[in-house]
Amino acid sequence: MKSILLIGMGQFGQILGEKLINMGDEVMIVDKDEDVINLLAPKYTGAVIANCMNADNLKTLDVPSYDVCVVTIADDFQSSLEITSLLKDLGAKYVVSKANTDIQRKFLFH
């Protein structure tokens, strides 16, 4: 069982979250949309309403304590890139970020 921090609970994040739970992982979800978090929270280990573009918000999540941090924000690449960078700066052990193009993948990979 792994501990997963899942940021961005749009369609892809919700599907991934369900699969991770079904595999027995502990999943903490984060999204800036209060309605989404309120709807999904009962299914997950934990749920936080937060804008992860703010480093202080990410610091409260104790990023290094998770085995994997996943960023599933696909419709705003700038946000995805910045959150990925912040997670790495905060000591994330392993970061996975969704990319829609090869160029986005290259930016996120480095």
Regions found by a protein language model. Name each.
Residues 1-110:
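Cytosolic regulatory regions of ion transport systems
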